[in-house]
């Protein structure tokens, strides 16, 4: 129970540290939110243009009206494209700033974790976590999340066209959201399995590269090659399973969206035949529904990146909580070369019983001390303690 409470406290501390970093990026995120509002407003340019063409141009047969409307549409789409490009660049900047502000912290925490019993992951994993988060922040998934709040606004506009069109659009949105949620829940375990399998293959690779001389000298090359192939095959199979399952949901969501847009056109055509709406409203409603459902479709296609980022954030929370940032140390006077050890007790961090107990000695400048003893007697433990790697 005490271990669980300690783990929760560490995760809370790590989450608070990451939240502080995100607060420093709040200004950039507010800019992106503002750009997203304008982009989504300007997305209504196409439907409004369609309405005006059907309601004004075709009825009046005025070429001048058509020219003015089209010129206005060109200008509005140019503005929308520029704003969409800018918000994408700002999000890419947010990802770069996030990594830049945490790179040193992650590097130091991973390095400390490499020599600590609490460091359960490979040091390079923390740096890969930063890459995953940066890729997600700069990817289309985050922009789709910012566009998602406009879904009910688009649905209200469709309701204003005709209640039946609004009901169909709402049902379509609910259906696609259910598919997206099912896909996220179903592929989550597959994603975790793929990440674990990939991590297992990396552990073998790191072991071989680190101890390459011993592997070659002891004739273990074939055994390690076989082990590495097996791990890579497991990782590849896990990735294929995950990609296959997420691909099914992506294809299902895309096909459903196209089908529902066609259903909107069919219902609109029926209402036109009953003279309840005009052809312009029929086309405009179909375009608006396509825009309303686009973020859900994009989120379905961004499963992997968003899941990787969420897993990376979770791992960084644990890492930062278990490896607090080092406090700035005051400047100390230059050492005079005297080393004094008094009643030292030390051993590997993961053990309770120290290898070295009650050790005392003193070395003055110019003196040398030789330490001899059998394997496992604590020579390396003493050296690590004197170097500050292990704590007594």
Q: What is each stretch, according to the model?
A:
Residues 72-84, 173-175, 250-260, 266, ...:
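Hydrophobic alpha-helical segments in the permease module
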Residues 303, 320-336, 376:
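Short, flexible cytosolic linker that couples an ABC transmembrane/permease module to its adjacent nucleotide-binding
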């Amino acid at each position: 129970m005490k271990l669980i409470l300690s783990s929760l406290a560490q995760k809370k501390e790590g989450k608070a540290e990451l939240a502080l970093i995100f607060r420093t990026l709040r200004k950039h995120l507010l800019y992106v939110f503002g750009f997203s509002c304008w982009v989504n407003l300007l997305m209504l340019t196409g439907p409004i243009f369609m309405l005006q063409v059907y309601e004004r141009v075709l009825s009046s047969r005025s070429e001048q009206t058509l020219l003015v409307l089209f010129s206005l549409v060109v200008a509005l789409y140019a503005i929308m494209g520029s704003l969409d490009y800018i918000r994408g660049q700002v999000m890419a900047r947010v990802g770069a700033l996030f990594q830049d502000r945490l790179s040193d912290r992650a590097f130091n925490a991973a390095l400390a974790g490499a020599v600590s019993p609490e460091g359960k992951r490979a040091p390079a994993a923390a740096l890969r976590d930063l890459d995953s988060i940066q890729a997600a922040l700069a990817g289309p998934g985050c922009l789709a999340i910012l566009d998602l709040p406009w879904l009910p606004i688009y649905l209200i506009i469709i309701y204003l066209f005709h209640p039946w069109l609004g009901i169909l659009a709402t049902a379509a949105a609910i259906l696609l959201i259910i598919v997206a949620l099912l896909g996220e829940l179903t592929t989550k375990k597959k994603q975790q399995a793929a990440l674990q399998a990939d991590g297992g293959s990396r552990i073998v690779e790191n072991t071989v590269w680190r101890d390459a001389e011993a592997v070659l000298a002891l004739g273990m090359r074939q055994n390690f090659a076989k082990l590495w192939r097996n791990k890579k095959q497991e990782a590849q199979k896990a990735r294929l399973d995950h990609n296959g399952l997420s691909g099914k949901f992506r294809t299902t969501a895309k096909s459903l969206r196209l089908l529902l847009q066609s259903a909107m056109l069919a219902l609109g055509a029926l209402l036109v035949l009953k003279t309840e709406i005009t052809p312009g409203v029929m086309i405009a409603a179909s375009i608006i529904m396509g825009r309303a459902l686009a973020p859900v479709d994009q989120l379905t296609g961004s499963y992997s990146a968003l899941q990787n980022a969420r897993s990376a954030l979770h791992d960084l929370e644990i890492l930062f909580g278990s490896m607090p940032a080092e406090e700035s140390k005051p400047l100390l006077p230059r050492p005079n070369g005297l080393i004094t050890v008094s009643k030292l007790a030390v051993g590997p961090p993961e053990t309770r019983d120290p290898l070295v107990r009650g050790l005392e000695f003193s070395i003055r400048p110019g003196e040398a001390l030789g330490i001899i003893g059998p394997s496992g007697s604590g020579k390396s433990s003493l050296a690590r303690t004197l170097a500050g790697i292990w704590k007594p």
